[in-house]
UniProtKB/Swiss-Prot annotation:
Catalytic activity: 5-amino-1-(5-phospho-D-ribosyl)imidazole-4-carboxylate + L-aspartate + ATP = (2S)-2-[5-amino-1-(5-phospho-beta-D-ribosyl)imidazole-4-carboxamido]succinate + ADP + phosphate + 2 H(+)
Family, similarity comment: Belongs to the SAICAR synthetase family.
Pfam family of the protein (one): SAICAR_synt
Protein name: Phosphoribosylaminoimidazole-succinocarboxamide synthase
Pathway: Purine metabolism; IMP biosynthesis via de novo pathway; 5-amino-1-(5-phospho-D-ribosyl)imidazole-4-carboxamide from 5-amino-1-(5-phospho-D-ribosyl)imidazole-4-carboxylate: step 1/2
UniProt keyword annotation of Oxidoreductase present: no
Species annotation: Lactiplantibacillus plantarum (strain ATCC BAA-793 / NCIMB 8826 / WCFS1)
Length: 243
């Protein structure tokens, strides 16, 4: 474990994680929570072991991305529910990368479910619980001073890199990466850095053999036991990462 890092004041509790300051101003203490939410947090249910599973999945993915040249905020996983991460100033954007039609894209454009795209589709959503995270385009991002055009361009570049690597990871697991959501922050030097988490909470995953959902849609649509599904994702991921 990083030497002498101590948990201090609670900074923020979100839908899936609680963030704490530490005795190092550059490091945050993240605790993954045993709960699932839907409808932008309006539905919240305790889920046994979910925090532990998501923490381990996210930790393995962040380490893999770093090993493949994609920098991110992950430092280490000192315990089952805790992650130490580099502190960044979060950019209030959710970046969604879509490889096939599903969810809101499918509904909005009446595209057949899981229609594959010739190239990835990138979308931005403005992070605001009050506004229900509305879609936002490049011009609107600039008009609202959310991020500069240069930062948006860098987010897009990194998002496509992440997509390329994640697609390969999940394919090796026998899983189709349909789409996913990621977030970025700025370091003290202004560098754009991948942050937040990558887990079945933020990805849409489909078993290539059975077509079964292996993500939070299991909770959203009451399709089965979320804990066992996330455990299956972790088991496959660990096998791939240890190969």
């Amino acid at each position: 474990m990083t030497a002498a890092i101590e948990k201090q004041a609670l900074l923020y509790t979100g839908k899936a994680k609680a963030m704490y300051a530490t005795n190092d101003p550059e490091i945050l203490w993240v605790e993954y929570l045993d709960q699932a939410t839907a409808l932008n947090g309006k539905r919240k249910v305790p889920i046994d072991q979910k925090g532990r599973l998501n923490n381990r999945i996210a930790s393995l993915i962040f380490k893999d991305l770093a090993n493949h040249g994609i920098a991110n905020h992950f430092i280490e996983q000192p315990s089952d529910y805790v992650q130490l991460v580099r502190r960044v100033t979060m950019i209030p954007l959710e970046t969604v990368v879509r490889n096939a039609a599903s969810g809101s894209f499918e509904r909005k454009f009446a595209v057949p479910h899981l229609t594959k795209f010739a190239e990835p589709v990138l979308e931005f959503f403005y992070k605001s619980d009050q506004l229900d995270d509305p879609f936002i385009n490049d011009s609107q991002i600039h008009a609202l001073n959310v991020a500069t055009p240069a930062i948006v361009a860098e987010i897009k570049r990194q998002a496509l890199q992440v997509n390329q690597r994640l697609t390969a990871i999940f394919a090796a697991m026998g899983v189709q990466l349909v789409d996913f959501k990621i977030e970025f922050g700025l370091t003290t030097t202004g560098k754009v850095l991948l942050a937040d988490e990558i887990s079945p909470d933020s990805c849409r995953l489909v078993d290539l053999k059975t077509g079964a959902s292996l993500d939070k849609d299991v909770f959203r649509k009451d399709l089965g036991d979320l804990t066992s599904v996330y455990q299956e994702v972790l088991t496959r991921l660990a096998t791939v990462e240890e190969a």
